[in-house]
Amino acid sequence: MTKLYRIEGTFRYEGEKYECDVHSYGTLEVCKIPGAPEECDVDLEYVETENCIEWDEELEDWHRIEACDLPEDVVEKIEGEALERLRVGDYKEVCLIGTKE
């Protein structure tokens, strides 16, 4: 079964606080920032990772999980080190917040 994870919450961009409005693009979930380019080439200054949710196929809805400790095979399939750095709290320029694979 395909597992879909995403980190949901707030982030700061250019000093302004935004809620994370997530849209799906192919197999990746990205954060759409108001006024940002479609390719989401922006700097996220701060991302709260305590709100981690997982897609439940049976319920067909998101449900919250206790921690953002994603399986290593999931992390390995994410482009770059974006989510890995989020997991360890080393925030960097990142747009990617999840994966379907």
Q: Can you say where each PLM-predicted feature lies in the sequence?
A:
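Acidic, low-complexity intrinsically disordered segments
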Residues: 31-101
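Short, charged/polar N-terminal "headpieces" of proteins
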Residues: 1-34
